[in-house]
């Protein structure tokens, strides 16, 4: 073999050029190392990602802030599911606030911020993903108790509702623990003449095995185990709804199912690409063309994964009737405050009190249902 041999301890990233081994003749086992340039992938990422991240940041921040404001104005109407959805909105807000940094990094082709910022932003993404999956698991279990275990629902949920804040704190804590490897291994370092913010495992023995181990643990606890819980819960939920033929129950669960499906549709493609990338680590016979394809796919699916941050508020607005009503009330109240007084003569305060009174009356009709999913 001519040329330099590949170091199997290196953990390749799809944005870096590397050497591939190709046969020099059909009958010869000799091969030579050729440089696989991923400049096309980097150029595509430099143009596509900043625009996509900017749009996701604007719409995600606006939508999730409105969700938090809506919950804040109508906090008496919360159920356990509402508390989980509120925490998911907070996680999404924290996440989209990091996107401008990544947009700048892709646009400039280098990580221009500090090493501490690199670790922090990478960690926030991992925590957001794991927290979202665990909260969706909690939502699924809450809906399972409310619908499948209807006879026990009131007793169980009435005991658990006051503890919803503790449950959310546990979820956040587990998310931090699951994502701890992200804070440890991600760092700013120089490669091919520019600084990057990527995982670096060269400080440990057998870095490829370490990367596979960390990736496996994150996927296991942050994706596959929650997914199994959701499949179990929603299988019995759908079975119960089909048997009940209750349109009101169908409306109550519709928004939750939509949120789960959208989240999985956004996250599964990118995680499958990461699995393929991990499976290719250390292989000598990696095709340059296939690596370019993986690079393009990773860029697009990553944007798709981030897109869920601004899709959840849209789902609430178009599917959740009570959320839509509450949101419209807030808009009317804000408009009323701006105008101070309507031509009819009654004040904004009176109108707001009327809205609150109506909201409280509506909530009393169904204390056990999620106010944002009916």
Curated annotation (Swiss-Prot):
Task: Classify the protein's membrane topology as the record does.
Answer: Multi-pass membrane protein
Q: What is the effect of changing residue 266 to S?
A: No effect on calcium flux and chemotaxis in response to CCL20 stimulation. No effect on cell surface expression
Q: So what does mutating residue 310 to S actually do?
A: No effect on calcium flux and chemotaxis in response to CCL20 stimulation. No effect on cell surface expression
Question: What is a single cellular component term in the Gene Ontology annotation?
Answer: sperm midpiece
Which segments cross the bilayer?
Answer: 48-74, 84-104, 120-141, 160-180, 212-238, 255-279, 304-321
Spell out the subcellular localization from the entry.
Cell membrane; Cell surface
Cross-referenced PROSITE patterns: G_PROTEIN_RECEP_F1_1, G_PROTEIN_RECEP_F1_2
CDD domains in alphabetical order: 7tmA_CCR6
What upregulates it?
By IL2/interleukin-2.
Q: What is its main location?
A: membrane
Record annotation: effect of changing residue 168 to S: No effect on calcium flux and chemotaxis in response to CCL20 stimulation. No effect on cell surface expression
Q: What is the effect of changing residue 233 to S?
A: No effect on calcium flux and chemotaxis in response to CCL20 stimulation. No effect on cell surface expression
Tissue specificity as recorded in UniProt: Sperm. Mainly localized in the tail and in the postacrosomal region but is also found in the midpiece and basal region in a small percentage of sperm cells. Reduced levels found in the sperms of asthenozoospermia and leukocytospermia patients (at protein level). Spleen, lymph nodes, appendix, and fetal liver. Expressed in lymphocytes, T-cells and B-cells but not in natural killer cells, monocytes or granulocytes.
A single Gene Ontology MF term assigned here is: chemokine receptor activity
The entry's stated outcome for residue 36 to A is: No loss of calcium flux but loss of chemotaxis in response to CCL20 stimulation. No effect on cell surface expression
Please give the biological process terms from Gene Ontology that the record holds.
calcium-mediated signaling; cell chemotaxis; cellular defense response; chemotaxis; dendritic cell chemotaxis; DN2 thymocyte differentiation; DN3 thymocyte differentiation; humoral immune response
Q: Name the keywords, alphabetized.
A: Cell membrane, Disulfide bond, G-protein coupled receptor, Glycoprotein, Membrane, Receptor, Transducer, Transmembrane, Transmembrane helix
Ranges per topology, Extracellular: 1-47, 105-119, 181-211, 280-303
What cystine pairs are annotated? 118-197
What Pfam families has UniProt attached to this entry? 7tm_1 (PF00001)
Q: Which residues lie on this side of the membrane: Cytoplasmic?
A: 75-83, 142-159, 239-254, 322-374
**Residues with glycosylation annotation:** 7, 23
* UniProt function note: Receptor for the C-C type chemokine CCL20. Binds to CCL20 and subsequently transduces a signal by increasing the intracellular calcium ion levels. Although CCL20 is its major ligand it can also act as a receptor for non-chemokine ligands such as beta-defensins. Binds to defensin DEFB1 leading to increase in intracellular calcium ions and cAMP levels. Its binding to DEFB1 is essential for the function of DEFB1 in regulating sperm motility and bactericidal activity. Binds to defensins DEFB4 and DEFB4A/B and mediates their chemotactic effects.
Its family remark reads: Belongs to the G-protein coupled receptor 1 family.
Q: What PANTHER family would the database entry show?
A: C-C CHEMOKINE RECEPTOR TYPE 6, CELL ADHESION MOLECULE
What is this protein's record name? C-C chemokine receptor type 6
This protein's species is: Homo sapiens
